[in-house]
Design a protein with these regions (language model features):
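Conserved, mostly hydrophobic/aromatic
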Residues: 17, 64, 155, 197, ...
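Core domains of carbohydrate- and sulfate-ester-processing enzymes
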Residues: 68-137, 206-221, 275-300, 415, ...
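Short catalytic/ligand-binding loop motif for oxyanion handling, primarily in non-cytosolic enzymes
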Residues: 71-75, 161-163, 203-207, 267-270, ...
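Substrate-binding/active-site clefts of carbohydrate-active enzymes
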Residues: 121, 156-332, 340-363, 383, ...
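Conserved alpha/beta catalytic core and glycan-binding cleft of carbohydrate-active enzymes
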Residues: 353-518, 523, 531-535, 568-575, ...
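Carbohydrate-interacting/catalytic domains
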Residues: 1-153, 158, 487, 492-497, ...
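Hydrophobic faces of well-ordered beta-strands that scaffold small-molecule active sites
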Residues: 151-153, 195, 259-261, 336, ...
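Short, flexible loop/turn elements at secondary-structure junctions
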Residues: 21, 43-45, 55-57, 68, ...
Length: 706
């Protein structure tokens, strides 16, 4: 009877479906000509409907028809005229076309709950497919890269390779394309340790987008939590996409890189009461969805998509945890980024980090071993939960993004918070015993401006989305450097390039886990569109034809990543401890903060609302950790100089107690100049809106950590 879903054993296929409200369930098998054969299933126990069919093979397409009460007012939406996807389908064929038959109500009378739409949806919906679970993984293993050694690259399967001329045309925009040797070599050379894929669970292409000639490019509209999205397959949709995905993961593991999935367990593609009936609604609506108390025809929505999964339902929780385990054990992925993760913690009204979902994940021997990253907010009351997740989780740090953007556009009163974000956001995470890796630092992501657009546009330009430029965030914390959009003015373009270098340097030399939005390292632009969720075209795809400036930015970013990875003081496991009142003035702390005169910053400096510069000393000799060889970690010392002023500032380097000789290793104003040497107390100019990094000339006395 178990497991749920369709299980091939070499001789036939076992089908199992959970539905508490069903009065009858039919298994529907489809042949090559779409002729349907219906087989009645048996409810054995615990509301699981079962059938074993000998002689069936992988590639067999199927669906379910569920007979039961249709009473939307009370949250019951069974309709046997709708062919339903298996919630546990491992592969899904096709997509939906927006036909009226997909809906349980009639378009002419959408508010008439008693009038059930009896049009058959089989010809207009997706079909589940049986897969062959056997795959030659060889000696594949999870890389298990430490959090603090990680550099994450957010990528889109299609957007990463659709314009990549090094990838064969027939596999561009697919799992196979993403696994092509030149793509993996590019990421490896860049210094990436993990690729984080935007949603690849089977999702729906919404009919309202299709009508406008657009598509659901981002994929945050899941309908199949076990099935890799079929449109990203170059080999087929009846299970071939599963093997293609596995081969991709295997290729990344062979290169020593991890694969993290962006997963959307907070809602499904069935939308609100006006949405289609594709799977869960028709199987057991009230067991999967959170309904409005006292008004069960409507869905409680904290996601902005029309529905939210019912996180206090054992069956919804089982679906999610079974899915997570499947992707780890069978598909070999290395972690998950949870979209709108605050919704997963809502057993009732409030976000609760002691919720059943977190308890289950924490205790699960499989899920708890991989990387868990939260988008720590949703659209509900009290949904902004940055810093509020359990200790085993990392979080997208939205406050990091906002603060770094504000600092580099010279917003008042940003210096103290900017300093905290650089050091791993201890104010957000240390209070409950977490470490710097709780913070996934990012400046840009798929949602919003690209790095290039962040320095090129003050306003969003989303006209191509067909919503009158009303969609997307209006407060982008961006600065166009004086001209809106593309320009031929050399000074403006030079400043934009420098601002991108400044932000990359900030990101990659901050404590925590850096995440790069794919294509930012080559100055990808979306032409000012900050909500390109529906743009499956050149607006979203990365253009790999690199001019001189884009090649130079790529080389610069790669240099910074490798600097970070080579020096443990730049990605510590634990928070820095600074100078405390009463400490010996001759003691050299783990971190020290200086003004431009070389004096230790005092309270007046921190409270200066128009201070946009500082100098930071990082003590590489005081890392309270051991390396892989069991030796105490010792690294070079570093000085970081930030100047977000519109004028140059002369900085006096610290006295010789902090180091006698220094080598300039990064200068965002002159990134290609040869390294210069400086001595303690010397003066160095930080040009307007620039960043400098100096490294001590001394060599570590013991091996550094890997």
């Amino acid at each position: 009877m178990y497991p749920l879903g369709a299980s091939y054993d070499g001789a036939g296929v076992n089908f199992a479906l959970y539905s508490q409200v069903a009065q009858k369930v039919e298994l529907c098998l489809f042949d090559e000509h779409d002729v349907e054969t219906r087989i009645e299933m048996t409810e054995r126990n615990s509301y699981v409907w079962h059938n074993y069919i000998p002689g069936l093979h992988p590639g067999q397409r199927y669906g379910y028809r569920v007979y039961g009460p249709y009473d939307p007012v009370h949250g019951l939406r069974c309709n046997p005229n709708k062919l339903l996807l298996d919630p546990y389908a491992k592969a899904i064929e096709g997509n939906i076309d927006g036909d009226e038959s997909l809906f349980s109500y009639w378009f002419k009378s959408p508010d008439d709950n008693s009038a059930m739409n009896d049009l058959d949806s089989a010809a207009h919906t997706m079909k589940s497919a049986v897969i062959n679970p056997y795959f030659d993984w060889g000696n594949d293993q999870h890389p298990y890269i430490s959090y603090h050694d990680s550099v994450i690259y957010e990528a889109h399967v299609r957007g990463m390779t659709n314009l990549n001329m090094d990838v064969p045309p027939d596999i561009r925009g697919t799992y196979a394309g993403l696994a092509y040797p030149s793509v993996i070599e590019y990421l490896k050379k860049l210094g990436i340790t993990a690729i984080e894929l935007m949603p690849i669970h089977q999702f729906v292409n919404d009919s309202f987008l299709q009508e406008k000639g657009l598509s659901n490019y981002w994929g945050y509209n899941t309908i199949g939590f076990f099935a890799p999205h079929n449109a990203y397959s170059s080999s087929g949709e009846r299970g071939e996409q599963v093997n293609e995905f596995k081969s991709m993961v295997k290729a990344y593991h062979r290169a020593g890189m991890e694969v993290i999935l962006d997963v959307v367990y907070n809602h499904t593609a069935e939308g609100n009461h006006m949405g289609p009936t594709l799977s869960f609604k028709g199987i057991d609506n009230a067991s999967y969805y959170r309904l409005v108390e006292g008004d069960q025809q409507h869905y409680f929505d904290t996601t902005g998509t029309g529905n939210s999964l019912l996180m206090r339902s054992p069956h919804a929780l089982q679906l999610i945890t079974d899915s997570l385990r499947y992707w780890v054990t069978e598909m070999h992925v290395d972690g998950f980024r949870f979209d709108l993760a605050a919704t997963l913690a809502r057993q009732f009204q409030e976000v609760d980090k002691l919720s059943a979902f977190f308890d289950i994940v924490e205790q699960d021997p499989i899920i708890s071993r991989v990387k868990l990253i939260a988008e720590p907010w949703d659209l509900g009351s009290g949904g902004y939960q940055v810093g509020g997740f359990p200790s085993s989780w990392s979080e997208w740090n939205g406050r990091y993004r906002d603060t770094v953007r504000d600092f580099w556009r010279s917003q008042p009163s940003t210096l103290p918070e900017f300093a905290s974000r650089l050091m791993g956001s201890s104010d957000l995470y240390q209070v409950n015993g977490r470490r710097p890796v709780a913070s996934v630092n990012f400046i840009t992501a798929h949602d919003g401006f690209t790095m290039n657009d962040l320095v090129s546009y003050n306003e969003k330009h989303n006209e191509a989305n067909g919503e009158g430029n009303r969609d997307g965030e209006s407060n982008n914390r961006s600065w166009n450097c004086g001209v809106e959009g593309p320009t031929n003015i050399p000074d403006v373009n030079d400043l934009r390039q420098r601002q991108m270098r400044n932000m990359f340097a900030t990101l990659l030399f901050s404590q925590g886990i850096p995440m790069i939005c794919g294509g930012d390292e080559v100055a990808r632009t979306q032409q000012g569109n900050n909500n390109a969720y529906c743009q499956d075209n050149e607006i979203s795809w990365t253009n790999w034809h690199l001019d001189k400036g884009r090649k130079e930015l790529l080389a610069f970013v790669s240099k910074l990543i490798h600097l970070r990875l080579d020096h443990p003081v730049l990605h510590r496991r634990r928070f820095f401890t600074g100078r405390e009142p009463g400490d010996d003035s001759n003691m050299i702390p783990q971190v020290e903060w200086f003004d431009h005169t070389g004096s230790i910053m005092d309270m007046d400096d921190w409270q200066n609302t128009h201070a946009f510069s500082m100098m930071i000393y990082l003590n590489g000799s005081d890392i309270p950790e051991i390396d892989w060889y069991g030796n105490r970690m010792v690294d070079n010392d570093f000085i970081l100089i930030f100047n977000a002023h519109y004028e140059p500032i002369m900085f006096t380097l610290p006295d010789e107690r902090y180091g006698r000789k220094w080598q300039l290793v990064v200068d965002t104003h002159n990134p290609n100049e040869p390294a210069l040497s400086y001595e303690a107390g010397f003066m160095i100019t930080a040009q307007s809106r620039s960043f400098l990094m100096l490294m001590s000339a001394k060599k570590p006395k013991k091996p550094m950590g890997l």
